[in-house]
Amino acid sequence: MNLQLFHLPLLLALALSGPAQAHETDSPSGPLGTVSFPTSCDPKVQPAFERAVAMLHSFWYSAGEKTFREVLKDDPGCAIATWGIASILMSNPLAGQGASAKGAEQAQAAIDEGRRIGAKSERERDYIEAVATYYKDFATRPEKDRQVSRAKAYEALAQRYPADDEAKIFFALYNAGTQTQADQSYAAYLKSAGILETQFRKYP
């Protein structure tokens, strides 16, 4: 991933100061950066899939969801695209608001579809199950509990695939989302910043 184009210094500042601004309705313009996210999908949809992941990183949620859905339409066997849809529908993890009830319903439908399709690789299945932890028992769990479950799932994902920089970056983002105002040590923010700083040194 070209992290510089994803404004990593800005993400670090956001982690230390406040929630990022999500682009819910706008269309992306300018460079989104590059993503390397290997999949078992048809090679013809790989560029669009990686562009959708770039949109997810850049908080371009409406355009990203549309692109993930187009990928799934063009390759109905691309189960990992359902992970992208469910991830987009969680909304901005740094804002603390989480998915809407309608978004959660749509996300669960996407997750169920991904499970039905069956990802061709264990890594892709693990990504789908990681995002699924956030939506489990959605109606009966508070947002903070969902955020903690999500962070733990992505931490496990990053540990299981130590060469997967995407897993590390998503864990850093979701871990930052667990920071509370009561914790004046800012442990979650600092841990996430450390992960992202390592990635920035790797991809200056």
Indicate residue ranges for each PLM-predicted region.
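Short coil/linker segments at helix-helix boundaries
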Residues: H23-A163, K168-P204
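Bacterial N-terminal signal peptides
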Residues: F6-S17
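N-terminal secretory signal peptides that target proteins for export/translocation
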Residues: M1-Q4
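Sec/Tat signal peptide C-region and signal peptidase I cleavage site
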Residues: G18-A22
